[in-house]
């Protein structure tokens, strides 16, 4: 059997077959053929360049060639060492099978060196290239290139072996510029272009520059909307074959990449690589603008847009613009209502796979991300990152309009919407509008009465996972959030933040109607309903309406008689946990709320607020019937009953109401004590 020739490793396509391939598949074929030729040259099988290779290098269609044109001539001279002998893209299984099958037919033991050369390094023409590569390799890897009579190196660098290299995690090729390592030389070559900014491929539509033609092709598919690869399971289409492969694992549940540190498995190798940085703490991507570091390059790229404020991806439906194509794709689902990711545990559907992943943790209770400072654990790495800023005091996001600083960019975005008044999310049931889609989702549960989050301890259900988390602390007694000022502890971080404002006196939310200021935006929203008289929450049992859903929930317990909160000290039961908390202070004698004006102390903040009105003489609650004003809304409510009972107008005058000895009759006369 003679030595291997290019004909043995060439794959032919007819014109019809070639036209059936898409651009990505044609590029893949081109890369495979060029690699086969480079490998033959590398082995010292000196061939004149076949017309097929010339054609492929000029990016012409190979199917237009005749069969005899593909046959290589007898050996003439040895070609130079091809440094980038590995292709830039992964070879598809179909091409792998054909190529490796052809290698097997001839046998790699028959891949002979050119006569007169005992080793690959003997060839003078590519000795320099070989020596350059040899310096990059370990001693073991270097020996792989030295063979006596037959060349085994060809098989050593086959696709099968390259696949093994990926799974063993070996990364012999290191970038001298930043120290990053790669398992393939071609990956290192591509990576180097990032440093030299060799962005030769430019998008004519948006002006974006890329250092790979494949990256430009991928980019074009984003705005063209070209999606060739469709999932047979759910019908979803993708613009890359690799993305489809990764997507299929959602259905199969396959997770072939496992972390040796904690045992967690992943469906993608890249996700495993990123995950490993949680354990190592590595953050190789640094922002030149603000100095912030990132463990993932994609997160770093997204972060950069914060500084540029570039938003190239626009929604055709509503005109809203985004800085990520993925965010636009997710946003479109608001208009279509599509929720392709479904939880098998409870049937809940989501429009993002990442949201489904986060949701699943509710059922498992898994909290793999632990704070080294205080030991608190979280189910999301992003929440751990946010939590750490409590210890460091870092607040990198500042809104110049109000001067407020935030630990998260998302919180800054939310705050901006408060000032602009933007509310793009509309409830179809009642017409109410919201600033955030998540708030609309929660609001809808009022109409559907859906409560997917259930307490295993007492069976109580909630419409928010955060409410369930807070509720569980009633059973455990856990209060992880402590005030450094007075030592008071809270079950929720939001309660601690609200409490801190008591000490600082900060009240950023002001009512335009009466000028009253509040610590929380939610309190301002509730307060506004006093002026509008809006009471959207109605009791089906008795028809009574309320301006807060929480008050309706409390009211319903009057009908059911439910009192789930019991005092261990005296066995007294309450309908609300807040009432139990207030009651406990009777036993302890605790009165943490003190009046700065007169020094009087109270066991409830609401009572201190009411008391302060004695000093300020503030009476915000006014009777529309007779203009009488009150310090409390409850007093106004009681007063209104006088008008409803048909009492004459002068009964509103305190002088006509007299002392305590009489009672008011329906006619307005007072019964005198006998």
Curated annotation (Swiss-Prot):
Pfam families named in the record: KRAB, zf-C2H2
Quote the SMART domains the UniProt record gives: KRAB (SM00349), ZnF_C2H2 (SM00355)
Q: Which residues form the KRAB domain?
A: 4-75
Q: Which cysteines are joined by disulfide bonds?
A: none
Q: Which GO terms describe its molecular function?
A: DNA-binding transcription factor activity, RNA polymerase II-specific; RNA polymerase II cis-regulatory region sequence-specific DNA binding; zinc ion binding
Q: Does the keyword Nucleus apply?
A: yes
Annotated region described as Disordered, given as residue ranges? 653-674
Where does it reside?
A: Nucleus
**One GO CC term of this entry?**
nucleus
**A Gene Ontology biological process term:** regulation of transcription by RNA polymerase II
Location of Phosphoserine modifications: 605
Report keywords, A-Z: DNA-binding, Metal-binding, Nucleus, Phosphoprotein, Repeat, Transcription, Transcription regulation, Zinc, Zinc-finger
Q: Which InterPro entries match?
A: KRAB, KRAB_dom_sf, Znf_C2H2-type, Znf_C2H2_sf, Znf_C2H2_type
C2H2-type Zn finger ranges: 145-167, 173-195, 201-223, 229-251, 257-279, 285-307, 313-335, 341-363, 369-391, 397-419, 425-447, 453-475, 481-503, 509-531, 537-559, 565-587, 593-615, 621-643
Q: What does this protein do?
A: May be involved in transcriptional regulation.
Q: What is this protein called?
A: Zinc finger protein 429
Source organism of this protein record: Homo sapiens
Its gene is: ZNF429
